């Protein structure tokens, strides 16, 4: 391990949106990149990345892998990221989004202690840890009060990051607000909206069914949030950071911008509200104050809300046209 010439990184969740962008960036920077892939999932195409079949919740396997690799940077992006699924499978979400993080943090600390080589840990946390926040916008001092099983598991992991930071691990928790890209799965509301709008524009669909149109979120561009991860890993000291644009928009706003991009202004005639799609407990107005990471690490978003939505619609139009 002491003879390595390149920085080494280990990524969990490489099959997802953020993991794909992160892997591409680190490979381009010349790092030796390794990644975990669940044994039951197909291997993603990640050029330049060494893939390891391993369940992130298998503590013994992950501990052995981290011990053998001793990564300079460890990014934990693996998670079940559906709030809706956390209501139907709360035990699984707790294991993957919470307990698995405990195992990874301990593995990183043990590898660091045994090798004498620092391991820098980045945890992808979520604005859902704030639940129904008592103030808006939220920052790092906002009380953590999750209102769903997903948020609760992420909150547990977020607290653990602080515990291991005090123990001597360079561990940062990034409270990531909603961030999108064409690589976001279509089951998420942003992609559901933009893909359906693109289909309607091409005569392939005639209705968009949604839940709560008034729900508000802080939506950003995924590659910007990956940049925040890398900056936090390489910062002089570890900390927790809210990563957000600072702007709140409703689902209704998103729908309007998406339809406007395809030349449809009277979009209400295409939208149906389905109460079955409303979450049992939906978080209130989630909008983040990212002043700390902007000041400390020089991070700032590069894409506006309008940029994000129109990029998604354009990508979905291309997909439909190519099908």
Please identify what each model-predicted range represents.
Residues 190-191, 196-323:
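C-terminal substrate-binding subdomain of Rossmann-fold SDR/epimerase-dehydratase oxidoreductases
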Residues 73-75, 122:
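N-terminal Rossmann-like NAD(P) cofactor-binding module of classical short-chain dehydrogenase/reductase
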Residues 9-29:
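N-terminal Rossmann NAD(P)H-binding glycine-rich loop of SDR-like oxidoreductase domains
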């Amino acid at each position: 391990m002491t003879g390595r010439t390149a920085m080494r990184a280990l990524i969990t969740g490489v099959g997802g949106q953020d993991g794909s962008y992160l892997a591409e960036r680190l490979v381009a920077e010349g790092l030796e990149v390794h990644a975990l892939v669940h044994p039951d999932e197909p291997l993603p195409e990640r050029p330049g990345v060494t893939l390891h079949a391993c369940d992130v919740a298998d503590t013994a396997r992950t501990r052995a892998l981290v011990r053998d690799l001793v990564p300079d940077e460890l990014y934990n992006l693996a998670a079940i990221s559906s709030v809706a699924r956390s209501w139907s499978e709360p035990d699984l979400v707790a294991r993957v989004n919470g307990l698995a993080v405990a195992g990874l943090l301990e593995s990183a600390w043990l590898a660091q202690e045994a090798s004498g080589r620092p391991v820098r840990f980045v945890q992808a946390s979520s604005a859902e840890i704030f639940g129904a926040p008592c103030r808006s916008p939220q920052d790092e001092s906002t009380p953590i009060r999750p209102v769903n099983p997903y948020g609760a598991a992420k909150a547990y992991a977020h607290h653990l990051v602080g515990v291991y930071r005090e123990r001597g691990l360079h561990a940062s928790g990034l409270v990531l607000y909603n961030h999108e890209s064409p690589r976001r799965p279509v089951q998420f509301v942003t992609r559901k909206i933009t893909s359906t709008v693109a289909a309607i524009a091409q005569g392939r669909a005639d209705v968009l069914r949604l839940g709560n149109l008034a729900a508000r979120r802080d939506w950003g561009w995924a590659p910007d949030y990956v940049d925040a991860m890398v900056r936090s890993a390489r910062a002089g000291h570890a900390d927790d950071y809210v990563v957000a644009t600072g702007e709140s928009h409703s689902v209704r706003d998103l729908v309007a911008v998406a339809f406007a991009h395809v030349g449809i202004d009277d979009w209400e005639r295409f939208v149906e509200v389905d109460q079955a799609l409303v979450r049992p407990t939906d978080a209130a107005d989630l909008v983040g104050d990212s002043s700390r990471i902007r000041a400390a690490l020089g991070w700032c978003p590069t894409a506006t809300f309008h940029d994000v939505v129109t990029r998604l619609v354009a990508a979905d139009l291309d997909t439909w046209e190519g099908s």
